[in-house]
Amino acid sequence: MNLKQRIFRNSSLEMISKIVGIAAGIFLSPYLIHCLTKETYGLWVLIGSVVGYFGFTDFGVRIATGRLVAYYRARQDAAKVNHTINTSLALLTASGFVVTLLTFVLSPYFGRLFHIGPNVLHVPTAVFLCGFAVAIGLPLTVFEGCLAGYERYDFINIVEIFMIIARVGLTVWMMQLGYGILALAAINFALTVAGGSVKLLLCYRVFKPLHVAMEHIDRSTIRDTYATSIWFLILAISVRISFFTDNVVIGYFRTTGEVAVYSIAGRLAQYALIAVNAFNLVLMPVSAAYDAQADLSKQRRLLLLGTRASFAAAIFMATIFLAYGRRIIHIWVGSGFEQAAIVLAILTFPMITQASQTTTLIVMQGMAKHKNLSLIYLAEALANLVLSLILVRPLGIVGVALGTALTNTLSSLIVQPIYVCRVLSLGVADYYRKAFLPVLLATAPLVALIVGFQYVWLPQRFITMAVFCIFSAAVYFGAVYLIFFTKRGLTRVSFAT
């Protein structure tokens, strides 16, 4: 199976999983707002945003595990694969204990910290369950890393799809019975354990020599893992600050109702990035294998292929958001969220730039050349946080969105491309010309067609809007595939560097 076939198979499965997840989110968000009220839904989003920081105690080990497994697999070194998995499992089990302690400390004070009234019940228990889910889930993520290292995204995504379906079913059931955020926290905990356990069993099937035992914990592997993972951690913290701290800033300085409004726009932008990442995540084992072979020309080819696909996908999402965003939000969650359309329009620009650089991040991670890129992301994230803190008081949630947009766009359009081109010995002008210019020229007529269609017919209901978006996506991505990924494409561009 060649590169394009492997990428197509894995990215297709990843995309299906993400589509199911996005569909579930599209259904559950307005449903939970209706069942819980806007303020309580905002509280649930806030709990998830805060507890999500506990995941940083993995110190990037999960992602490093996938990278190292792919690397040693390419070298056919089963012993090192075993050492990597066992060592990572020990490290993340220790992290789980740390998260449990942090959860005990935070739970009683969460309501006081974010000015939650005493009339909202079970907040400490819900926070504890969410934190404990992170603690239990940390060591289980090692086995997902193993599956990713072996490029078994089919197993990963089948499990994820079943977990998503179960989450939707259980959520609807609990809401119908009249339960609140405590039930949501319990569902999250149960499914975290169930999904991780299934991936553990699948890992045994994929890597038959796997033997979980203390004797396989290796000190040299600890050094290798942390040498790789610490920069994954900085990346994860930076991304979290850039895209998820906004809810915490708004929750602290404003209200949970405004958290709910911002989260609707942020969720749409996040869905777009998830869709793009579905393609790119499967590239890291490929890049790691090329790194093991010391093949720089293939890394350049992989970068250009991934960037063009990511940028084309981002342009489609941006077109839909800018032309139809206000209508989509109104159809989706109803009245009371009008300001979310303004926030979405602002967040669309960092969504495009961030999506266009997703392949850069993945390739640098695969090559273990992401140290400097991590520092770039960290500087961007800190600037974003400072701007958001400055702008949240005078401009509210719009100011928070502007802080994200300004810093991310500057970093993704200028700083990151310069760095990756230097690492891969690729001319910056060649990079822009081969990765971005053909996509802009080829997709311009398609974008004009989608935007102009609103003057002919504007969808008024959820089902008609969904059909319109699906039809537009089919036409757009079908044309993009014919143009860029077939031998007879009209504007086929050479990958020669």
Model-derived segments and spans:
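Signature of the first transmembrane helix
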Residues: L3-Y71, G96-F104, A133, M163-V168, ...
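Membrane-interface junctions at transmembrane-helix termini in multi-pass inner-membrane proteins
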Residues: K4-S11, A135-E160, L177-L182, C203, ...
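Interhelical loop/hinge segments that connect adjacent transmembrane helices in multipass membrane
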Residues: M1-I7, K199-F243, V286, D291-R301, ...
